[in-house]
Amino acid sequence: MPVQSVAELSAQLPVELPVELPAQFAHLRRFALDGALLLFDRDTGLNVLCEGEETAHLKQTAPRMVQFAITNSCNLACTFCSRDIKSNSDWTIDEAFTLLAELSHYGLLEVAFGGGEPWTFPGFAELVCRLYDETSLAVNFTTNGLALTTEDLAAIKGKYGQLRLSLYDDNDWRNMVAMLAREKARFGVNYLVTPERLKTLETTILELCELGCRDILLLSYNGYDQDMHLSKEETSALSGTIKLMAAALKGRCQIKLGVCWGEQMQSVPRLFNKADCGAGREFLVITSDKKIQPCSFHQVALPVQTAADVMNIYNKRRSELESAALMPGCSRENHADHWARAKREEEEEEEEEEEEKEEESVTAREDGKEAIAIQRPGGQA
């Protein structure tokens, strides 16, 4: 496929979006929602929502963003990671570029690279720059920071929307945050809130702010380790901490919540009150072994090769893409239901084991009686 310029790609965007706009918004990229029009500037991150009679006929026909696992390779071994560590890393730079350029033509606004660790993918900086220069996409990525250097930041300067730094106990995040702030990188941090981390959350948030971080995203745990999930009491305490910190740091630092919190954080003030996380509709995950998922925690994984494959699944398999993940923590299904089901399954397995033991015991007793009967004289049992 010959590479097309931004102007050529933009000129081929869907024709059903000829909504008249104020002059100051006319240059923004257009994205159709159901009954509304979203305007987007990839360089500033500006989003403008237009809604009225002029947009009532519009329908969303593409995901707004894809989360792209460019590689399954990682330089950390986190026990709670949701990715399948046995999955292949099948993408090349050219294949990834072609797929994303075509998805941009279908209307996609953003790509967020992850993995694995994207900076272990050979030529990642080249891919970021090429996507910015030759498509209309906003390019973002999530990293643990261990392989990211100041030279890498210089190579992609002005070419990415935002980088997100994941904070772990073993990735020297304090020095990394300080470096990103010093280099004036456009960044935020991702922080997984567990019962243990909740105890020091206020201190961590204040420290991040002091180091120069202006964007903190608090994530909930998705997985089968019940000790990593917050209790109702801990969730309530977290809500209080968020409200306190948001008020104290207003104008200095934004505190955000991951979509997987769902309705657990109802008491926390929100910019938008969305009832759904958007997985499978607002965004898709593209895996390192060329499959698409509604989200990285989801059991549905459908093989694709081209952008046409992606769009065909997106438009024709809505019920699968918008279903709840089976993994505990999904906001589409109360994770308490998962634990109740898991508990029932565990109890059923224990009952089956007890029944098997009882059957073995009965058989052993019967065998014993036969042996005794044979040994006794006179045929008496």
PLM-predicted stretches and their roles:
Residues 2-25, 31-34, 291-381:
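Flexible mid-to-C-terminal extensions adjoining Fe-S/redox cofactors in radical SAM and related proteins
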Residues 18-63, 76, 132-133:
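Recognition helices and adjacent regulatory flanks at domain boundaries
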Residues 58-94, 295-297:
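Canonical Radical SAM [4Fe-4S] cluster-binding loop centered on the CxxxCxxC motif
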Residues 73, 77, 276, 329:
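The −1 position to Zn-ligating cysteines in a subset of zinc-ribbon hairpins
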Residues 42-62, 262-264, 301-315:
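Short, charged low-complexity linear segments at domain edges
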Residues 218-295, 368-371, 377-381:
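A C-terminal junction/extension of Radical SAM enzymes
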Residues 93-113, 121-220:
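Radical SAM/AdoMet-radical enzyme domain recognition
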